[in-house]
Amino acid sequence: MQERHTEQDYRALLIADTPIIDVRAPIEFEQGAMPAAINLPLMDNDERASVGTCYKQQGSDAALALGHKLVAGEIRQQRMYAWRAACLQNPQGILCCARGGQRSHIVQRWLHEAGIDYPLVEGGYKALRQTAIQATIELAQKPIVLIGGCTGSGKTLLVQQQPNGVDLEGLARHRGSAFGRTLQPQLSQASFENLLAAEMLKTDARQDLRLWVLEDESRMIGSNHLPECLRERMTQAAIAVVEDPFEIRLERLNEEYFLRMHHDFTHAYGDEQGWQEYCEYLHHGLSAIKRRLGLQRYNELAAQLDTALTTQLTTGSTDGHLAWLVPLLKEYYDPMYRYQLEKKAEKVVFRGEWAEVAVWVKAQ
């Protein structure tokens, strides 16, 4: 790849999930990175801070000299080993630093001296980030159909099954409710936006996309918020509402929040610690809405949750959770969603059970 990139080149990198060897410091990477990037820094956080201070006090030549002094000898050898291995594992990859400046050029030169020619992103992460932002703004202008419905309606699955669907909750690593956390930590806001842009670009590139199918989300999904350009378009979008029987919703919630989460926690942490993490996850979710439930109702539901967990631990049955889940849905989640839906009733264009909504969406 040439080192003078056009806008199309940057978009192509995101669409192809091109491996990116990001040589920025870890603190920069954590604040925002591209989806296919791995962080193999030229300088660690402390080294970067020292060079930055030197640059401000003594200028660029002194800072460059300090950088070479800090990244020398065994440290340089260790980092070269990691870069070489990454290049060999990702022959179609590309180097990236903050702005396509000295850091990526230095690593590129060192690799060349070691017999590896590897391209870099001219303009660096900043250019890719601006491309992601602009792509989201442009792609959000296409028509949108939102999938709505009460908790447990299978909205996310319906979106996932559409070729023009984008699973916002999956990208955010959060299901959007008090019980919405997953075992994967949420990304930084910038990384979430970059991932969303890449997913929209890939989805758009696979087909002659006429409209987006998205879940009816609020502005916040856990700690991530939707880009304003997309959120604004979603407030104007048509809504198809899934209205499944209450019992079907309970089955889905039992599978998703009790059976699957228990499995995921024990798979990640082992039986004993996994069980403790699972119990803490459910209690934390209930505690998050304590103020809205009121102390008395919260205490009642928390006691029922404890009883259900004891039953699940001793018998393996999750049926006991219905004692607190049913009133939580009927007294809190369902009224809250219906109230929110009433405020945008004029946007609702279709209602039906899950299969009916799926057929309707595919016909659009």
From Swiss-Prot:
Key words of the record: Selenium, Transferase
Family the UniProt entry places it in: Belongs to the SelU family.
Protein task: Involved in the post-transcriptional modification of the uridine at the wobble position (U34) of tRNA(Lys), tRNA(Glu) and tRNA(Gln). Catalyzes the conversion of 2-thiouridine (S2U-RNA) to 2-selenouridine (Se2U-RNA). Acts in a two-step process involving geranylation of 2-thiouridine (S2U) to S-geranyl-2-thiouridine (geS2U) and subsequent selenation of the latter derivative to 2-selenouridine (Se2U) in the tRNA chain.
PANTHER family: TRNA 2-SELENOURIDINE SYNTHASE
Record protein name field: tRNA 2-selenouridine synthase
Active site (catalytic residues): C97
SMART domains: RHOD
Gene name of the encoded protein: selU
Any single biological process term in GO: tRNA wobble uridine modification
Record-linked SUPFAM superfamilies: Rhodanese/Cell cycle control phosphatase
